[in-house]
From Swiss-Prot:
It comes from the Bacteria. It is a multi-pass membrane protein. The keyword Cell membrane applies. NCBIfam families: PRK03818.1, YidE_YbjL_dupl. This is Putative transport protein YidE. Belongs to the AAE transporter (TC 2.A.81) family. YidE subfamily. The keyword Signal does not apply. Keywords: Cell membrane, Membrane, Repeat, Transmembrane, Transmembrane helix, Transport. Pfam families: Asp-Al_Ex, TrkA_C. One of its GO terms (biological process) is potassium ion transport. Its main location: membrane. One of its GO terms (cellular component) is plasma membrane. The lineage of its organism: Bacteria, Pseudomonadati, Pseudomonadota, Gammaproteobacteria, Enterobacterales. The chain crosses the membrane at residues 4-24, 28-48, 65-85, 95-115, 158-178, 371-391, 393-413, 437-457, 464-484, 493-513, 533-553.
Length: 553
């Protein structure tokens, strides 16, 4: 059997064994995709014992390409929400998550200096303790750039594997301790979160208002400031028994019923100006109007603003809402359409069909992947990661590397959405498939390279002390920030659990947090809020630590 065939066969065996290990769960918690690392260690041990030689160049390529696929698809997935998460609404959560990352780096630096832990080993312990695989890849990349011998770089994978198991268990232990210390009632916390959402600014709601302000009688909608804004959409108007789709030039009269869409505060302000909220239904049932959701798939409208498409003037159709990446938004006239946007249309059936044809509404396109943008994005990401950043006093130039470059580029492209006929939308199923393939390939190779010496290191070497160092790196930041967030910021327990899981970019921990309450989405929401920024910082941190330690050494 050729070297290539043998290498592929062994990798396939690693994936099978590792995924099987990952599916084993104790009390609903397992290693998940991280099981592939341990599958690689097991197979790597026996491959080494048997004296089998695999293709080193091929393993190196597969490891790097797998990492690129993984971080790129993560960036495309979270890109649309990344920059929004940095705004004020998620600022507090992100600050606490950043504090966890910084404290983890400080603990790592202190351990490195006190116990004289070799640089590759301490970086591997750091990556495993925070359960972040891209950090492992970024650390190995910068060590190679610094001229570290290959056998020492491979030690990073071994120390990562030592620290990884407690990294997963440690976050779950922290959640349990927070619940025990503060005697948390999970049901009460879920109800508090729901009530805070209802009073917040994040939910799009509707309100039916009767026009009672005499100053508005016989005025056009466009002349009423609160209605002629990007915060409120008037999608229906009922006069006597007639329901119509209003346009900016529609004249409103006293007694008209307006169906408004917007955020709660804006709707309340509109009600104070216009009149009184009523319970009267403005349903399209029994009328010649209907409400329908269509999806944007036509490349010709991508990037165009809603106002420039003139749907109301041409088709007598109003867009009442816009759903982007699962987030409901007010369909402001300045909003630009992106591939995969879901539009809520109000109008007559024939008119809605006409608008649907304009925007595409081809459901099958949502299941197709444009491969050209994928490779353009990966290529640009690799180029970005290769740009040297020279910092005075540092022995080598800093680089985003093969982990950071594709991630940053994917975040930018995911936020842009489309350029001309190229769109970076990727169906969730395709994104997940590429992401899982990438991380399986990466972890399989890391495990194989670590497996030969793993048992000896654990039983006769420094393995147990590495595990101990990892426990400090995992627990000190989590417990400290958890206490600060709960005591001083009065953070909701479920939100806190999601933030802690997100700060470690740990899907098994998120699964555990979600299972704390069957219906609350608090943990998932906070996890998604901090995940993009934390993922970026987790990739940059080992590179900074490596360069700083190298310069000090």
């Amino acid at each position: 059997m050729s070297d290539i065939a043998l290498t592929v066969s062994v990798l396939a065996l690693v994936a099978v064994v590792g995924l099987w290990i990952g599916n084993i769960k104790v009390r609903g918690v397992g290693f998940g995709i991280g099981g592939v690392l341990f599958g690689g260690i097991i197979v790597g041990h026996f491959v080494d014992q048997a004296g089998v030689t695999l293709s080193g160049d091929m393993l190196h390529f597969i490891q790097e390409f797998g990492l690129i696929l993984f971080v790129y698809t993560i960036g495309i997935q979270v890109g649309p929400g990344f920059f929004a998460s940095l705004r004020v609404s998620g600022l507090r959560l992100n600050l606490f998550a950043v504090l966890i990352v910084i404290m983890g780096g400080l603990v790592t630096a202190i351990l490195h200096k006190i116990f004289a832990i070799p640089l590759p080993v301490v970086l591997g312990i750091f990556s495993g303790a925070v359960t972040n695989t891209p950090a492992l890849g970024a650390g190995q990349q910068i060590l190679r750039d610094l001229g570290t011998p290959v056998d020492l770089v491979d030690q990073m994978g071994m120390s990562y594997a030592m620290a990884y198991p407690f990294g997963i268990c440690g976050i779950l232990l922290t959640m349990w301790l927070m619940r025990l210390i503060f005697r948390v009632n999970v049901e009460a916390e879920a109800q508090k979160h729901e009530s805070s959402l209802a009073n917040g600014h994040s939910l799009i709601q509707t309100m039916n208002i009767r026009v009672e302000n005499p100053n508005l009688n016989n005025m056009a909608i466009q002349d009423v400031p609160i209605l002629n804004s990007d915060k409120i959409i008037c999608s229906r108007l009922k006069r006597d028994d007639t329901l119509m789709v209003p346009s900016p030039g529609t004249i409103i009269q006293a007694g008209d019923l307006l169906h408004l869409v917007g955020q709660p505060t804006d709707l309340h302000n509109a009600q104070l100006v216009i009149g009184k909220e009523v319970d009267t239904s403005l349903s399209t049932r029994g009328t010649d109007l209907r409400v329908e959701r269509v999806v944007v798939t036509n490349e010709k409208v991508l990037g165009k603003r809603i106002r420039d498409l003139h749907f109301k003037e041409r088709y007598d159709v109003v867009i009442s809402r816009l759903n982007r990446a699962g987030v409901e938004l007010v369909a402001s006239s300045d909003a630009s359409l992106q591939f995969g946007d879901i539009l809520n249309l109000v109008g007559r059936p024939a008119s809605i069909d006409a608008v649907a044809n304009v925007v595409g509404n081809a459901q099958q396109k949502l299941q197709q992947v444009q491969m050209l943008p994928v490779f353009i994005g990966i290529g640009l990401g690799v180029l970005l990661g290769s740009i040297p950043l020279f910092v005075p006093g540092f022995p080598v130039a800093l680089k985003l590397g093969l982990a950071g470059g594709p991630l940053i580029m994917a975040l930018i492209l995911g936020r842009i959405g489309s350029i001309g006929k190229l769109y970076w939308f990727m169906p969730p199923s395709a994104n997940l498939a590429l992401r899982e393939l990438g991380i399986v390939l990466f972890l399989a190779v890391v495990g194989l390279k670590s497996g030969g010496d793993f048992v000896d290191t654990l039983t006769q070497g420094e393995g147990l002390s590495w595990i101990g160092y990892g426990i400090f790196i995992t627990e000190i930041p989590l417990i400290t920030v958890g206490l600060l967030a709960r005591i001083f910021a009065k953070m909701n327990y479920l939100t806190l659990c999601g933030m802690l899981a997100g700060s470690m970019t740990d899907p098994p921990a998120l699964a555990f947090a979600n299972n704390l309450h069957a219906t609350s989405g608090a943990a998932a929401l906070s996890y998604a809020t901090v995940y993009p920024l934390v993922m970026f910082l987790r990739i940059i941190t080992p590179q900074l630590l490596a360069v700083i330690f190298w310069g000090m050494g």
